[in-house]
Amino acid sequence: MWAALKSPLLMGNDLRELSAESLSILNNPAIIAVSQDPLGQSANLLLRDTNVKKDKYGMGETQVWTGRLYGGDQLVVLFNAADEDVDMTVELAEIFYYQGPEGSAPHVQQEWDVYDLWANRMELETAQEILDASNNSDLFEKLLKQANWFNSTEVSYKDGLKAEDPRLLGKKISFIEARGSLKASVKRHSAEVFRLRNRGSKVKQYMLAKDEL
């Protein structure tokens, strides 16, 4: 959510004690590319459903967030704060509501490839090897090179996105037909994050939502 909302990421943990799982989450270039997207526009809350299973404190809901990305792409976040796994569905007419309500946006009439932004994050074994080599600069550099991880000090996120670097796009998992829907099973207390990419000609991007900040 911090990436979708273009918020700063503040890490209060001791980086010397970072776990492989934490490194795999924090250094995911496909997620960081959303945070550093050249448009710099936050996602907007689209849908909220409180008619879900609550936890012992009576809390629980699901949310759908959506927003524009560089190059005509679209971000979709399916957030599940319910006390169970939830199958979530959102239509293109809803995803592009802020570009035109009631399905009037031209985007709804087009097909979209769906990219999972979590699918290609660093394997835990690789992350642990890198952490273990933190005091061995030669081995550290060798492991980073073998991992072929995106390095923003060499190529900016803007240039990487312009070049359609696959490391920034996530893993293509499906496509949505015109006037179709995005469907995903979202685990309890987690989120699924997707980048939608137009399969045909690009359409002019605009937003009806206002940035209040």
List where the protein language model places each region:
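Glycan-recognition and catalytic regions of carbohydrate-active enzymes
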Residues: S7-T89, G100-S104
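Residues that form generic nucleotide/phosphate-binding pockets
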Residues: A3, I25, L117
